[in-house]
Amino acid sequence: MTEIISTTILLVLIMDPLGNLPIFMTILKHLDVKRRRIVVIREMIIALIVMLLFLFVGEKILIILNLKTETVSISGGVILFLIAIKMIFPSEDNNNEISSSEEPFLVPLAIPLVAGPSLLATLMLLSHQYLHHMFYLVGSLLISWFFTVIILLSSSLFLKLFGSKGVNALERLMGLVLIMLSTQMFLDGIRAWFKN
């Protein structure tokens, strides 16, 4: 049960729904509210399909590359640490001020904003680490995906409630939690490496 909770938190932090809120709103601002909801749901379903694909194929890719669990854990910790640093100290061009009169399809909402390289790499690493607990991983992925959908569908409410500064503060807080999780993953990998 604790594995499901920690994995769900990890995936939500990497999906970064709060960080993606302003970008989603900028890209979809020219659409009416009803159409915006349809586009968000469609893009999130596409992202889910891509994420599930990487979750189930990830282990096979790692076997082909002949990577050990310790390597996966250490590199996963480093990747997540870098993501967390970007969340705490976002750069100006990180905001991807994309504005288009066209309706987005697949890019940039589903990929790379939700199912980005960091999330797909993490899913591959998790599928290798928890090979015999795939049911829990799928459950964690679905819970975190659903949570992200709810936040993105309630984007205007969240921005009204917290304001852009409040959303930024929450994202930085999520970054701090992700730093702790990534450090733990890194240390677990080092410990396992020394044991072997």
Curated annotation (Swiss-Prot):
It comes from Buchnera aphidicola subsp. Acyrthosiphon pisum (strain APS). It is a multi-pass membrane protein. It is found in: Cell membrane. Its main location: membrane. It comes from the Bacteria. Belongs to the UPF0056 (MarC) family. This is UPF0056 membrane protein BU449. The lineage of its organism: Bacteria, Pseudomonadati, Pseudomonadota, Gammaproteobacteria, Enterobacterales. The chain crosses the membrane at residues 8-28, 45-65, 71-91, 105-125, 134-154, 174-194. One of its GO terms (cellular component) is plasma membrane. It holds the Pfam family MarC. Keywords: Cell membrane, Membrane, Transmembrane, Transmembrane helix.
